[in-house]
């Protein structure tokens, strides 16, 4: 099969796709998640925040948009005293950015892969507090809706849901996959990237179906 013609079906059934994604996350690997063509129509590369490595961060920076985001629950953002980036969110998709962050210690300019990993580690440490972070910085936290993908079908919520289901703390790192010319990767290109790098691929809708199958309609996500 030519890679340009790859579709989600190439990666198995919806259930199998989520299974493979969770297995990768449990092993400290990454996943690719696409949303609906009528929404952002983008694919995000996602890693667990607790275990992300410098090579994984370098991969995000090299192949993605450069806007590295840390997806968090509301409890995390309150614990870290992270206010929303704006009081009135007029973003079309209601993407919930907080003010950006940097680790208070152990970083230089905050831009390198190592510095961004240090910032994420500072934010998600078990004893993390507002004093561990500087504001603004080069990592962009996103606040997930409490109901996850059952409340909002976004990459932020998909990331937090996947981490929880994989047994990680509900926090993950994402960045949007881009092409060499700087344009956004769509499903065929995301699928080809997944095959080339042996990364599982699933969709937000796959995760919605998985959660419905678990009878989780009323289960909120918490830290």
From Swiss-Prot:
NCBIfam families of this UniProt entry? ribB
Which branch of life, at top level?
Bacteria
Query: What is the protein named?
Result: 3,4-dihydroxy-2-butanone 4-phosphate synthase
Q: Which residues bind D-ribulose 5-phosphate?
A: 39-40, 44, 152-156, 176
Tell me the route in metabolism or biology where this protein functions: Cofactor biosynthesis; riboflavin biosynthesis; 2-hydroxy-3-oxobutyl phosphate from D-ribulose 5-phosphate: step 1/1
Per the record, GO CC terms? Answer: cytosol
Q: Which family does it belong to?
A: Belongs to the DHBP synthase family.
**Keyword Lyase on entry:** yes
């Amino acid at each position: 099969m030519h890679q340009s013609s790859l579709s989600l079906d190439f990666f198995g059934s919806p259930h199998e796709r989520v299974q493979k994604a969770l297995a990768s996350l449990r092993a400290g690997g990454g996943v690719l998640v696409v949303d609906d063509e009528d929404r952002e129509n983008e694919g995000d590369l996602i890693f667990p925040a607790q275990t992300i490595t410098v090579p994984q961060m370098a991969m995000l920076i090299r192949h993605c948009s450069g806007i590295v985001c840390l997806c968090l629950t509301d409890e995390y953002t309150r614990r870290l005293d992270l206010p929303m980036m704006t009081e009135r969110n007029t973003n079309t998709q209601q993407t919930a950015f907080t003010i950006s962050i940097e680790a208070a210690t152990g970083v230089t300019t905050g831009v390198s892969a190592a510095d961004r990993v240090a910032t994420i580690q500072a934010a998600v440490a078990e004893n993390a507090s507002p004093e561990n972070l500087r504001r603004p910085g080069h990592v962009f936290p996103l606040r997930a809706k409490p109901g996850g993908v059952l409340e909002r079908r976004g990459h932020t919520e998909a990331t937090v849901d996947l981490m929880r289901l994989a047994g990680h703390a509900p926090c993950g790192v994402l960045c949007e996959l881009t092409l060499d010319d700087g344009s956004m990767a769509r499903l065929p290109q995301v699928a080809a990237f997944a095959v080339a790098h042996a990364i599982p691929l699933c969709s937000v809708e796959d995760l919605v179906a998985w959660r419905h199958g678990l009878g989780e309609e009323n289960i909120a996500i918490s830290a």
